[in-house]
Amino acid sequence: MSLPLNPKPFLNGLTGKPVMVKLKWGMEYKGYLVSVDGYMNMQLANTEEYIDGALSGHLGEVLIRCNNVLYIRGVEEEEEDGEMRE
């Protein structure tokens, strides 16, 4: 069982690293976390959109509003180059 984390230091620690953001509506976005504001809105760079686990397209720079996020996780380097793992 994992320990709960304070979200602001967690997100600040992910800044500049590859992340996967899943929205409440099922879409997933993989990119580099550029910044997070006080409301936890997120800016991603080099973003790819995945729908049902399949690459849908390359979007580039994306801003995600905080209330749409289901979860965010760091992406390991192997995942960044290869296929997405669940």
Curated annotation (Swiss-Prot):
Residues 6-78 form the Sm domain. Disulfide bonds: none annotated. GO terms for biological process: 7-methylguanosine cap hypermethylation; mRNA splicing, via spliceosome; RNA splicing; spliceosomal snRNP assembly; U2-type prespliceosome assembly. Keywords: Acetylation, Cytoplasm, mRNA processing, mRNA splicing, Nucleus, Ribonucleoprotein, RNA-binding, Spliceosome. The keyword Transmembrane does not apply. Coiled coil: none annotated. SUPFAM superfamilies: Sm-like ribonucleoproteins. The modification N-acetylserine is found at residue 2. One of its GO terms (cellular component) is U2 snRNP. It is found in: Cytoplasm, Cytosol; Nucleus. Plays a role in pre-mRNA splicing as a core component of the spliceosomal U1, U2, U4 and U5 small nuclear ribonucleoproteins (snRNPs), the building blocks of the spliceosome. Component of both the pre-catalytic spliceosome B complex and activated spliceosome C complexes. As a component of the minor spliceosome, involved in the splicing of U12-type introns in pre-mRNAs. As part of the U7 snRNP it is involved in histone 3'-end processing. PANTHER family: SMALL NUCLEAR RIBONUCLEOPROTEIN F, SMALL NUCLEAR RIBONUCLEOPROTEIN F SNRNP-F. Core component of the spliceosomal U1, U2, U4 and U5 small nuclear ribonucleoproteins (snRNPs), the building blocks of the spliceosome. Most spliceosomal snRNPs contain a common set of Sm proteins, SNRPB, SNRPD1, SNRPD2, SNRPD3, SNRPE, SNRPF and SNRPG that assemble in a heptameric protein ring on the Sm site of the small nuclear RNA to form the core snRNP. Component of the U1 snRNP. The U1 snRNP is composed of the U1 snRNA and the 7 core Sm proteins SNRPB, SNRPD1, SNRPD2, SNRPD3, SNRPE, SNRPF and SNRPG, and at least three U1 snRNP-specific proteins SNRNP70/U1-70K, SNRPA/U1-A and SNRPC/U1-C. This is Small nuclear ribonucleoprotein F. The gene is SNRPF.
